[in-house]
Amino acid sequence: MYGNDAMLVLISYDVSFEDPGGQRRLRRIAKACQDYGQRVQYSVFECVVDPAQWAKLKHRLLSEMDKEKDCLRFYYLGANWRNKVEHVGAKPAYDPEGPLIL
């Protein structure tokens, strides 16, 4: 499903609500992550992207955040991510290579 250059990036964010724009930034950052990946916890997303998609997503996220108040973390799990992710718990595991049912 994904090319050889696809990689898994784990994205976590913390958006400040100290100013009125905080909720707007939060919605926009979450929407950008949802456009490229799957929410696995409230403010954590797994995104399987190729380098071009990652460049677009990262640019979009950085342009939405307030660098003085918000925090984004990117964890690059690379192309061999399948061997690096283990799921334990009640929620079903997300399989980005599985079938998509609409």
Swiss-Prot record:
Binding site for Mg(2+): D14
Protein's name according to its UniProt entry: CRISPR-associated endoribonuclease Cas2
GO biological process, alphabetically ordered: defense response to virus; maintenance of CRISPR repeat elements
The gene coding this protein: cas2
EC number, UniProt record: 3.1.-.-
Role, per record: CRISPR (clustered regularly interspaced short palindromic repeat), is an adaptive immune system that provides protection against mobile genetic elements (viruses, transposable elements and conjugative plasmids). CRISPR clusters contain sequences complementary to antecedent mobile elements and target invading nucleic acids. CRISPR clusters are transcribed and processed into CRISPR RNA (crRNA). Functions as a ssRNA-specific endoribonuclease. Involved in the integration of spacer DNA into the CRISPR cassette.
Phylogenetic lineage: Bacteria, Pseudomonadati, Thermodesulfobacteriota, Desulfovibrionia, Desulfovibrionales
EC primary class: hydrolase
Assembly mode: Forms a heterotetramer with a Cas1 homodimer. Homodimer.
Record-linked PANTHER family: CRISPR-ASSOCIATED ENDORIBONUCLEASE CAS2, CRISPR-ASSOCIATED ENDORIBONUCLEASE CAS2 3
